[in-house]
């Protein structure tokens, strides 16, 4: 049985590329914002890993990370953050707040796959 990954990113192209590439080895659910992701999770869906962009409308990825880590039902789900920002300060802050990893966009699909495998396989 394939492990489940929830991908949250407001850019449909990122969702499509990652879903196609990761879909060979994982069951990927793509949602375009954290609000929809929270609704999906509250329906009883439990992914093995979440990949979330940081800069999104409605709710930012860092807010989503804090929400997830404060929630007893979801805090054990590993979260990998995606961002085009190369800020070391932001990266350190997110890792301290519970992110499992931080990957810069544009990302190499093979690198993403290797990092995911290290976390959930």
What do the predicted segments below correspond to?
Residues 32-49:
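Acidic, metal-coordinating helix/loop segments flanking the phosphotransfer/catalytic sites
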Residues 12-30:
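Two-component/phosphorelay signaling modules centered on CheY-like receiver
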Residues 107-116:
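C-terminal output helix
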Residues 85-86:
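Short, conserved "switch-loop" micro-motifs in signal-transduction and mechanochemical regulators
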Residues 56:
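Receiver (REC) domain active-site loop signature in two-component systems and cognate sites
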